[in-house]
């Protein structure tokens, strides 16, 4: 029986081939070279985490599990609200079929603010990495559950070639062990199981203490309150990717500021 991730991968691979036929790689690479210099995604998170929390605020219109999340979807306005609310970086969904995202959303968000931006998509091909840079992305996502070790290495190398950072996403101890063979410092612990889309913060509680000290933990999914952040900080998480809970708020700037008000709890005692 196919999972949600299986179905996403199937259509994404078809989409990649269609895009290659429509726009040759050389044209994408020319656009990538002409894009503004990367803004330093990992550097910004590391600086924020040194004194408090690093927040990757996500611009997401819909999801496979929740359907439409936000009807009033003005990307530049949302990006500016996140920036004003204290976000460190942005994550922008560009997948269309499952998340109602679009490449243009990433471009709009990048141009509206000075924050580093993550292209949030299902990346399988170096063509998509060049696309990300051409769109203004400063970081890409590699989902270990959906790629082989050799694919992950190839995608990471391509991102590095374009001066971008990589957020390496894991959901299990096995995936974390595989991720440790990559050079990327950012380890995203997804509290959502991408096969079932069920969410549990216990995933971060379990994996965070197993992440090498030279890596920076980003806890993703299922984060709704300042207490959630304070709780996971006790396990070593200092950075968080939050989308749905902020997207559902009428005043996104105020909601962003409020969730960052969590008192920073020192690691230990668990």
Curated annotation (Swiss-Prot):
It comes from the Bacteria. GO terms for biological process: L-tryptophan biosynthetic process. Its EC number is 4.1.1.48. It catalyses: 1-(2-carboxyphenylamino)-1-deoxy-D-ribulose 5-phosphate + H(+) = (1S,2R)-1-C-(indol-3-yl)glycerol 3-phosphate + CO2 + H2O. Keywords: Amino-acid biosynthesis, Aromatic amino acid biosynthesis, Decarboxylase, Lyase, Tryptophan biosynthesis. Pfam families: IGPS. GO terms for molecular function: indole-3-glycerol-phosphate synthase activity; phosphoribosylanthranilate isomerase activity. Pathway: Amino-acid biosynthesis; L-tryptophan biosynthesis; L-tryptophan from chorismate: step 4/5. Gene3D superfamilies: Aldolase class I. Belongs to the TrpC family. This is Indole-3-glycerol phosphate synthase. It comes from Cereibacter sphaeroides (strain ATCC 17025 / ATH 2.4.3) (Rhodobacter sphaeroides).
